[in-house]
Regions:
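N-terminal helix-turn-helix
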Residues: 1-82
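Amphipathic alpha-helical effector-binding/dimerization core
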Residues: 62-158
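Extended hydrophobic
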Residues: 170-194
């Protein structure tokens, strides 16, 4: 596939630390990534040298300051959230609910920005966070915008995870519900994700 295994493993370690959101020990990281401790240590040590990972006094690892620096640079260089912000504010004020700017990345949705509405209905979406397509309003909007064959292929890649008892995990049922999203021009998530 043209990838370098050690770089891929290092990226997976960063992903783990990002998703967990709390410092992890070498033993925890090695176990979660199914790596020998010596391999995990070597990867973490290299990432620490480049300040992509930091190690606390207790020996636990977390994301490093260099990633924050890179994130700030990307944020400054990418105008989409800044340009969209006035429209999000206007929309949130008009409809009295939260307005969210998202992009689709494969089978996930990433939140770029959000503006809280003043009504009782609120969207809780972490900027920079990734959400599943099949059980979030943003994800359903993206799915509805695709050709049906493309949406079907995307949903058929892996089983649809049930996050709550209300999550639709049957691809055919979800595809049928997308017709309503197309007709009304918006999607609703009603206890399907959280």
């Amino acid at each position: 596939r043209g990838t370098v295994r050690s770089v891929a493993k290092a990226m997976e370690l960063l992903q783990l630390l990002s998703e967990r959101g709390e410092p992890l020990s070498l033993t925890e990281i090695a176990r979660m990534q199914e790596l020998p401790k010596s391999t995990a240590f070597g990867l973490l040590n290299t990432l620490r040298e480049y300040e992509m990972v930091s190690q606390g006094r207790d020996g636990r690892y977390s994301l490093g300051i260099r990633l924050f620096e890179y994130g700030c640079r990307v944020s400054r260089a990418w105008d989409v959230p800044r340009l969209a912000r006035p429209y999000l504010e206007q929309l949130a004020a008009q409809v009295n609910v939260s307005a969210v700017l998202s992009i689709r990345e494969g089978d996930r949705v990433m939140t770029l920005d959000q503006v809280e509405g003043h009504g009782s209905l609120r969207v809780v979406s972490e900027v920079g966070g990734r959400l599943p397509l099949h059980c979030t309003s943003q994800g359903k909007v993206f799915l509805a915008a695709l050709a049906e064959s493309e949406a079907q292929a995307l949903l058929g890649r892996r089983p649809l995870t049930a996050y709550t008892p209300h999550t639709v995990t049957d691809a055919a049922q979800l595809l049928a519900s997308l017709e309503q999203v197309r007709r009304q021009g918006y999607a609703v998530e009603d206890g399907e994700y959280k």
